[in-house]
Regions:
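Short, well-ordered beta-strand core segments
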Residues: 36-38, 137, 183-185
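Conserved nucleotide-binding/hydrolysis micro-motifs of P-loop NTPases
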Residues: 42-46, 84-86, 143-148, 189-192, ...
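A general structural signal for short secondary-structure junctions and capping/turn motifs
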Residues: 8, 28-30, 72, 129-130, ...
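Glycine-rich loops and low-complexity Gly/Arg-rich segments
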Residues: 43-45, 61-65, 103-106, 163-165, ...
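Conserved GTP-binding G-domain of TRAFAC-class P-loop NTPases and closely related GTPase folds
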Residues: 149-217
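Structured helix-beta-strand junction loops
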Residues: 75, 133-134, 179
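P-loop NTPase motor core
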Residues: 86-174
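Conserved P-loop
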Residues: 2-93
Length: 217
């Protein structure tokens, strides 16, 4: 049986993740995408003239709103989930409720976190279906400074990571990054300037920068 071989770029909708510290402009940037509809979980779009779904009050409601776009892709060209932090918290709450326990730790042996990762994966699968329907998907996330251990001459240092649960068994931040076609990090660009009088370095600047490749910041 012969299979046809295609060559060249295949135009498709994009899966984009934007993360950065609070107030950097993640929502503003997401609103620049073509004809966006927001699933605004934190009320971040109150001052924006954008289309939005009702704020989801549960994990299931979030999945239902995503499914609505999958069934009716003509309603927008970009679906924005703002933010992944809230989605993760709703996912954990759903797993706890479904398991009839009081805490994610009550499952024992890290099973609760594994269940949460599997459940979050369902959301990413649904979002992939939205992309396959021709709609861009943008997911925003807050960032937090964490210590990063590197087994080489660089040793350990602090760097910005998504403010999502991270462990050896369950790394939802890594899952989200692997899912995305494009991972963008927004931050303030600062530089150190020595004070002539005290000879101490002070941080100056504050220009907003979007990093599109890996950066130790």
């Amino acid at each position: 049986m012969a299979f046809p071989i295609n060559r060249g770029i295949v135009p498709t909708a994009k899966k984009v993740v934007i993360y950065g510290p609070e107030g950097i402009g993640k929502t503003t940037f997401a609103a620049r995408f073509p004809n966006p509809v927001f699933i605004d979980t934190e009320g971040s779009t109150k001052e924006y003239d954008v289309a939005r779904f009702p704020a989801p009050t549960s994990w299931q409601m979030l999945l239902d709103e995503v499914a609505e776009v999958k069934k009716n892709p003509q309603i927008c060209r970009t679906l924005v989930i703002d933010t992944a932090d809230w989605a993760e918290a709703a996912c954990f709450a759903h797993v706890i409720s479904a398991g009839q326990v009081k805490s994610i730790e009550d499952f024992g042996y890290g099973k609760g976190y594994v269940k949460a990762k599997e459940e979050f994966g369902k959301l990413l699968n649904e979002l992939t279906e939205v992309v396959n329907a021709g709609v861009n998907v943008v997911v925003t996330a807050h960032a937090a400074m964490r210590k990063f251990e590197q087994p080489d001459e660089m040793g350990s240092y602090d760097r910005w990571e998504m403010k999502l649960y991270t462990s050896q068994k369950t790394n939802i931040a890594a899952l989200l990054k692997e899912w995305a076609d494009m991972v963008l990090f927004a931050n303030y660009k600062t530089f150190a300037v020595k004070d002539k009088n005290s000879n101490k370095a002070k941080a100056q600047g504050g220009q907003r920068v979007m990093y599109t490749t890996h950066h130790p910041c």
